[in-house]
Amino acid sequence: MLTDPIADMLTRIRNAHLALHKEVSVPRSKMKESLAAILKQEGYIEDVATEEGSIKLTLKYFKGKPVISGLKRVSKPGRRVYVGMHEIPKVQNGLGICILSTSRGVMDGNSAHESKVGGELLCEIW
């Protein structure tokens, strides 16, 4: 049994990119679907397909190199990290995104700042 399914998803994406795989499959949950939708919206992955019990992510490459250079899980089950609206970090000086779980759902840092909400800082992607 997994203790941190979000970290597992990020690790699967990282490993698939390092192995230059075209697709990766992760077990399905609402939180992971929201994360995948944000990654697609921000241009880090090409496509998201939900199948019964799993989510299939089509990874994106530019000139043979992965579009995602790094993934970092911030808030972990043993140490939760919460940020207010004014404390949302800029990832890699604005070249990356952070993803938050807010009272209005899962959203990236820019959307959370525009909506004037803070929340749990799930991960950073650059």
UniProtKB/Swiss-Prot annotation:
It comes from the Bacteria. GO terms for molecular function: rRNA binding; structural constituent of ribosome. One of the primary rRNA binding proteins, it binds directly to 16S rRNA central domain where it helps coordinate assembly of the platform of the 30S subunit. It comes from Nitratidesulfovibrio vulgaris (strain ATCC 29579 / DSM 644 / CCUG 34227 / NCIMB 8303 / VKM B-1760 / Hildenborough). One of its GO terms (biological process) is translation. Belongs to the universal ribosomal protein uS8 family. Part of the 30S ribosomal subunit. Contacts proteins S5 and S12. Pfam families: Ribosomal_S8. GO terms for cellular component: ribonucleoprotein complex; ribosome. This is Small ribosomal subunit protein uS8. Keywords: Ribonucleoprotein, Ribosomal protein, RNA-binding, rRNA-binding.
